[in-house]
Amino acid sequence: MKVVAFERSVQGTSASRRLRNSGKTPGIVYGSKDPALVIELDHNALFHALRKEAFHSSILDLEIGGKTQKVLLRDYQMHPFKPLVLHIDFQRVSATKKVHMRVPLHFTNADTSAAVKLQGAVISHIATELEVSYLPADLPEFIEVDLAKIEVGHGIHAKDIALPKGVTLILHVEQENPVLANARIPAVKAAEPTDTPAAPAATAPAADATKVII
């Protein structure tokens, strides 16, 4: 995926504000042996690119001044309540150096699992992405989590899934082995009210109205 940016000569809060007012987004590129470079990008093109899953989990071709470099999206900031990208960070990548990144999870075969079809279980997705390590050439767009054999009362853990070739779990994820999805039977609904009228309450005996005269 190609991203076009331009080198930015002016920095600072005021300069960034003017940049945003002109329809641009400030950013930075860092990493590798080259110095960090401040850049600007067309806001609308960037905003729509950020809506694509592949933009978050792909090696991007960042073109600056006619030269292209391989980068990863590392971070971006959005306005609290406006559809406005305030800032974006890219990291340069080397073809021979592994990178760590969170990759989206795609869950499959939940509807065909025995837990759902035969036992009426509900599948809950506990995680939506997984942090892994890989060389840039092996970057997966997503990682598939097959739920066909999930069992009620049990979960699918990170170490249970088949990772794409060249992709490994980072150390702390492998040690923690988090749950990615689980299956459970829904709680029984409260009993429905019946149409049978309730029996009338017993009536207390009437007090004796006879007065005793002494």
UniProtKB/Swiss-Prot annotation:
One of its GO terms (cellular component) is cytosolic large ribosomal subunit. GO terms for biological process: translation. One of its GO terms (molecular function) is structural constituent of ribosome. Disulfide bonds: none annotated. The keyword Transport does not apply. The keyword Ribonucleoprotein applies. Keywords: Ribonucleoprotein, Ribosomal protein, RNA-binding, rRNA-binding. Signal peptide: none annotated. Belongs to the bacterial ribosomal protein bL25 family. CTC subfamily. HAMAP family: Ribosomal_bL25, Ribosomal_bL25_CTC. Part of the 50S ribosomal subunit; part of the 5S rRNA/L5/L18/L25 subcomplex. Contacts the 5S rRNA. Binds to the 5S rRNA independently of L5 and L18. This is one of the proteins that binds to the 5S RNA in the ribosome where it forms part of the central protuberance. This is Large ribosomal subunit protein bL25. It comes from Polynucleobacter necessarius subsp. necessarius (strain STIR1). The gene is rplY.
